[in-house]
């Protein structure tokens, strides 16, 4: 199956769906979701491997540019961790809940809608941890969510200001006034300082 997102990537109609997650956010997410070696983990949109390369076996990935479509993936895994494409987030969450009992995603603050929360609860999934992040080189605040299937539990909430550092090289940058000294693009994975 060739998904619409692959067609958009090839035609560059929706370049905002291709944003590589910086290592500092990947490390933060893996720590925040209590990732343990030995868990079966899926990186649903591998990109250049920021998540995948830090995971131990058993691990698997999907990558639409390699014709490995997330929506065709049916194996059960212990954990899914990644940065999903926002333009199809509802469909993405629906499929996520069919193949795992726990997932950790970074999503834009305004993407956590009542409709999505209700749909998760209808499927027995609840947010167990939420981290609000302010990343100066991203255009909005983001949530790192840990969502688990099972009984509703109290939510752990925290806030982390990533600071005015380039996410790619850790050198100071001007945040939103000056998106970064390194002249990188959202699709770059390394600083070009």
Feature map (PLM): residue ranges:
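Class I S-adenosyl-L-methionine-dependent methyltransferase catalytic core
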Residues: 1-177, 181-188, 192-193
């Amino acid at each position: 199956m060739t998904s619409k997102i692959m067609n958009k990537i090839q035609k560059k109609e929706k370049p905002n769906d291709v944003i590589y997650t910086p290592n500092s956010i990947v490390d933060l997410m893996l720590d925040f979701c209590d990732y343990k070696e030995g868990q079966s983990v899926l990186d649903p949109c591998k990109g250049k491997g920021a998540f995948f390369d830090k995971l131990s076996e058993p691990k698997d990935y999907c990558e639409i540019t390699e014709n490995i479509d997330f929506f065709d993936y049916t194996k059960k895994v212990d954990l899914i961790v990644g940065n999903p494409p926002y333009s199809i987030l509802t469909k993405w969450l629906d499929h996520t809940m069919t193949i795992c009992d726990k997932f950790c995603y970074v999503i834009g603050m305004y993407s956590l809608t009542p409709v999505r929360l209700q749909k998760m609860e209808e499927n027995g999934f609840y947010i167990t941890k939420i981290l609000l992040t302010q990343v100066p080189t991203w255009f909005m605040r983001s949530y790192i969510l840990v969502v688990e299937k099972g009984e509703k539990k109290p939510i752990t909430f925290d806030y982390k200001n990533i600071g005015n550092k380039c996410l790619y090289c850790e050198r100071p940058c001007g945040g939103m006034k000056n998106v970064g000294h390194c002249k990188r693009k959202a699709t770059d994975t390394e600083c070009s300082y």
